[in-house]
Structure formats: C-alpha cells, structure tokens
C-alpha cells in the first residue's frame, strides 16, 4: 500500500497543509515541536482511529477552530481509496471513504495499515500493564477491524457494571442482586471475545518477535512473550473461557462489592515480556530494552503484512537517534523500499548517502512543510 497524499486542516499546529509523497521513504526534518510527530499522528489516526499519545479529540483540533480534518489518498493492490476523518472539539467524529460517510467507524478501519514506532514505545517494556494492553489492542484493530467494536462493547458493559457495583456499595443490596447477574452475563460474553482474540494474536506475534530478537541480539538473548489473562485460560474455547470467567466473578463477589469496582476481566490482563527468563523491565540496559521494542515492531510489520497481504506503512518518530548504529542498520536494512516509511529526525546525519538519495526529504517548520529548508 502507498500513501500518495495527505491533507491536514486545523489539525494540531497545521492550518492547511497538503503533502504529496513521491518516494517509498520520506524523511521529515526539523527542530523539536515543529509538527513532525503531528503528521505521523495523523496517519496513525487514519489507520487505527487511535493516537499513541492518548490525545483527546479536542486536543487535536487547532485553537479557535471547531473541527480538524485529515484527508488522504491511498493506493492499494485493490485500487485507490480516499479517506477522510473529521475530529470535532465538541461532538462525534465523522469518517468517510471515497466521499461516502460511514455510519460505523469499524468500516473505516483496515483500509490503511500502519505501524508506529516512537521513543515513547520504551514504555512497552517499562510501563504499566495498561500500556501493553493498549499496544496489543491497537494491533488487533488492524488485524481484525471488528475487534474495535468488540472492545467498545466490553468497555461499555464494564463501565455500567462498575456504576452498578458502586450503587450496591452505597445501598443495602447484596451481591445476589438479580440485576448484577445480568451485568455478569454481559461482561462474560463480551469479555470472552476480547480474551480469545488477544490470545490468538499474541500466539501469532510471539514467534515472529522472538526470531527478530534473536537476529538483532546476535543470538545472545532469548525473548519470550506470553499472554497472562486475568481470567484463567486453559483452552481457547468460548464455553471454557466463559465458565472460568463466571466462576472467578463469583469468587471475587465480596471484594468487588467492598471496592465498588470490577476485579475480574480482560481490563486487568498482562502481556509478559521476559529476556533470558527475567522480566524485561528488570533486565539490562536501555539498549537491550530498545532491542526488544524493535523486535516487537518488526514482528508487527511482518504479521500485518501476512494478514492483509500487503506491506503496511511504517511510521518512525525520532527513533533512529535512540538506537545504536548496529540496531539502526538492522532497522534500515529491513525497511529498504519494501515498506513505505515516514521518518522524523532533527538532522540527516543518521542516514547514509544511499538512503538520502533514494528518499524524499521534507523540511518542517511551525506547521509548514517544504522541500527546502528555508520556509518563509
């Protein structure tokens, strides 16, 4: 797939900027806080309808403006698609494909696929379980767009069940309350779908990431990735998962009443990353942790390509400076011209002459993009 054009209006610090991509590799050069990352964020939003910066829509809309618009033209093996995403300071998003508004956002997902790799991704190793869940969910949305709807359903039931538990906590009702049993059943049904899909996705991703990690580390380290669902998963069969889920809910009924919140379910899952059987967050240097994240990202690229049958876009946000020369070379050698790649950097010294000669170089300054570094 190839992103031909991108048009940003009132998005972040872009007033009205159109970009035409003329090479498989585009290097965006500029000082910090000029808008390089914002452009990559716009592409990420078109791919996943999510921002890895966890920004709210109103934060994405330029000050004094009611809405922001991201338009793109994408070329795939199946033909050319025009994508449009409107973000409102107050109100719902609107998505359109080839000029036609879509009622369901999940029908927009899967048209553009992209893997984002930024310096923030070290949090995959060092951060909380929520960071790893969000990463896995974002990947799943691209592998199986209906997952966005499944996850939304689960989160909605979870919020409503939590509100009901809070209500029980403040009243004389007991955990035997019949309305709670209804929420339990809905939580189990929707949560089981989340658990099974997360389990399947990691089962496919883990061996790819392990192989990349072995290659990058020179076979000196062994990476293991395991899904540790909050609900005990003996078999990935709907009936068994639902039974285990319901059983654990019943076991935790009293603590849930006491705390007024749901203590069982995929919102408490963990993805465990270990290197040489030691938890990765406790293991070694930042360089080794970067190797792990690089392996995960290369595995994401590979898995998405296997599933959608086309190479996804790769968005590299200021990561080359974070990698040592050998890891830089591993990444750049893997990319070549196979993946359309957008790279942000503050200087061009990280790239050799061959890369520079085969890349489109754009200069970014205060939300304006030019082919020369003297924007007026």
Swiss-Prot record:
One GO CC term, this protein: cytoplasm
Amino-acid positions noted as binding ATP in the UniProt annotation, renumbered to this chain: 30-37
UniProt-recorded Gene Ontology molecular function terms: ATP binding; single-stranded DNA binding
Any Pfam family: SMC_N
Intracellular or extracellular location(s): Cytoplasm
InterPro entries: DNA-binding_RecF, DNA-binding_RecF_CS, P-loop_NTPase, RecF/RecN/SMC_N, RecF_2
Keywords: ATP-binding, Cytoplasm, DNA damage, DNA repair, DNA replication, DNA-binding, Nucleotide-binding, SOS response
GO biological process, one term: SOS response
Top-level taxon of origin: Bacteria
Transferase found in the keyword field: no
HAMAP family: RecF (MF_00365)
Function: The RecF protein is involved in DNA metabolism; it is required for DNA replication and normal SOS inducibility. RecF binds preferentially to single-stranded, linear DNA. It also seems to bind ATP.
PANTHER family: DNA REPLICATION AND REPAIR PROTEIN RECF (PTHR32182:SF0)
Family matches, as NCBIfam families: recf (TIGR00611)
Similarity-based family: Belongs to the RecF family.
Name under which the protein is recorded: DNA replication and repair protein RecF
The species this protein was found in: Trichormus variabilis (strain ATCC 29413 / PCC 7937) (Anabaena variabilis)
